[in-house]
């Protein structure tokens, strides 16, 4: 449904600009749609990490003369680094599996593992479909295992 909305938006944009900017069937259209679709995952993860930072750290930083940008780089970023990494991993795994928007919005001759799997399965070539499907599983599994390892080491270090 979101892919259809993106197609309509880009069609309106193309008509409004007199077809100067054609984004509907380009990689930019796919990137825009994936950004809109998966924005909630990293946003929620980063906000969750940011909300755990006590506000008195920012007050102490200002009283010590640090600017807002300096505080962001020296205090905020190191404290929410794990939240950013976890959000990036979860977003990456979801993007690798995404088929509907990629199938609708992709440019001609632009294939992903999900579109290869879909095409082979649609043609009932299950053996050929198993290879890209297996890679989707492996590509999705490795970051999740790394994230699980990080979480286990984090929770065991607290005990």
Residue ranges and their predicted role:
Residues 1-35, 69, 105-109:
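Membrane-interfacial helix termini and adjacent extracytoplasmic/periplasmic loops
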Residues 2-6, 42, 46, 88, ...:
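Hydrophobic/aromatic residues in alpha-helical transmembrane segments
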Residues 27-28, 58, 69, 81, ...:
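Residues that define the loop-to-transmembrane-helix transition and helix capping
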Residues 28-40, 89-96, 106-108, 135-140:
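Hydrophobic transmembrane alpha-helices
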Residues 29, 36-58, 96, 100:
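Membrane-embedded alpha-helices of multi-pass transport/permease systems
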Residues 41, 82, 140-144:
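Hydrophobic transmembrane alpha-helices of multi-pass small-molecule transporters
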Residues 47-77, 89-90, 130-159:
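C-terminal transmembrane helix and the adjacent membrane-cytosol boundary/short C-terminal tail
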Residues 96, 102-145, 152:
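Interhelical loop and adjacent transmembrane-helix boundary motif
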